[in-house]
Amino acid sequence: MKGETMKITLIGCGAIGKLWLSSLTLQGHETQGWLRVAQSDLFVDVNDPSGRTFRELIPCNNINHLQTSELVIVCLKAWQVSDALLPLLGNIPENTPILLLHNGMGTIEELAPIRHPILAGVTTHAAWQKNNQVFHVAHGITHIGAINSQAQAYYPIADILHEALPDVAWHNHIQTTCWRKLIANCVINPLTVEYDCKNGLLIDYPKQISQIIDEICAVMEAEGLHTDKSELTEYIYSIIYNTSANYSSMLQDVRNNRRTEIDYITGFLIKQARAHGLSTPENDRLYHLVKNREQQYDDFRSNLHRSW
């Protein structure tokens, strides 16, 4: 499949979604976006770290394009995925792979049972959006892999995506990679909300970080996953140092009165812990702290009825 062009639909056109749309379009793929409020096209304006710009009108919400798509990529918040995807499944060919790119875990369970090949992915690319302009501020790695047996034959997609937006790596055990990203999210996201700080200032709270990691390691071991606390701690601190000047996505959501992904990050961890009879007191406390912040938003409850 390397060098092959594909017909692709990308559901969710935020900063990361537009980054993928621009990269795949430049590579010659036949792309379209898919928006909650349907429109025929979308102006995509992406600026990369080298100063290059992409400015094109990309078609959107064409049902015929969706029905003949060879790949569907979902770049939404975790809590938006099932609302967005489930109504569309009947228009996506059953042999078309669907790649989920989002923070957190638990969306797969909401989509079950599903016949389509499902791929999960996590990315370390950093991008933000202001006034509909996307700024790709840091290159990263996107890790993808099969979630169900139907998706195992689709490993060549990693090469196609790598050509568009490197680096992309295929993993035979993507769940381990997803758990690794979950650990970072469980530490960095809620703690930055609690202390209203940039990521780098979390080095002042080593005891809390250690307790969170201890609780997560216990859950991972109960799930049958290998853990090494010292290695995971080093991994977490490397992220804190490398993103020291950044505000976490969860803190940005709270500051902008938006719903967070806490239910699919710390909430998912707590749910798995309960299934194994484990307690997670520090993660419980942080979960309720973020949920209480959400409930303070004037418009939060009115937004709950909205689909993605």
Give the location of each predicted region.
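Helix-loop-beta segment of a Rossmann-like dinucleotide-binding subdomain
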Residues: Q133-H143, V193-L201, N246-N256
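Rossmann-fold dinucleotide-binding core
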Residues: L101-T177
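Rossmann-like NAD(P)(H) cofactor-binding subdomain of soluble oxidoreductases
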Residues: W20, A38, L42-F43, S50-Q133
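NAD(P)+-binding Rossmann beta1-loop-alpha1 motif at the extreme N-terminus of oxidoreductases
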Residues: K2-L57
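Active-site-proximal catalytic alpha-helix in oxidoreductases
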Residues: Q175-C217
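NAD(P)-dependent Rossmann-like dehydrogenase/reductase catalytic/cofactor-binding core
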Residues: K2, D214-C217, E221-W308
